[in-house]
């Protein structure tokens, strides 16, 4: 009887230690703070990478960051796989929200912007962000809530 209680208690401890640690993530995904993450080495443009992420799991998207700790966690997963490569993150079309004006204060009436949209990459070693044409291809990281 004592051995049964000991084994039952041990199983309960194991179960409780796994719950809330991302145990709900699929086996090929990594967990951090109730989210699941996966690095994909295949290079895609930003739009195709986002579509691919959405196909992987319900509510999955290109990775977003809520803190530097989360970004560091993602870097710890991307760097061993990709070394110094850039990866797509879920930030895109940031310039659409900017209100630009000339340095002399006059309104922007004429522009010669490239038709290329700009999206954001993150450097896998140090989390520095860079704008790149959304049509370029890079590896990417997907994220969903566990």
From Swiss-Prot:
Expressed by the venom gland. PANTHER family: MANNOSE, PHOSPHOLIPASE, LECTIN RECEPTOR RELATED (PTHR22803). Belongs to the snaclec family. Keywords: Disulfide bond, Hemostasis impairing toxin, Secreted, Signal, Toxin. This is Snaclec stejaggregin-B subunit beta-1. Pfam families: Lectin_C (PF00059). Residues 1-23 form the signal peptide. The keyword Ribonucleoprotein does not apply. Its main location: secreted. GO terms for molecular function: toxin activity. Disulfide bonds join 25-36, 53-142, 119-134. GO terms for cellular component: extracellular region. It comes from the Eukaryota. The lineage of its organism: Eukaryota, Metazoa, Chordata, Craniata, Vertebrata. Residues 32-143 form the C-type lectin domain. Interferes with one step of hemostasis (modulation of platelet aggregation, or coagulation cascade, for example). It is found in: Secreted. Heteromultimer; disulfide-linked.
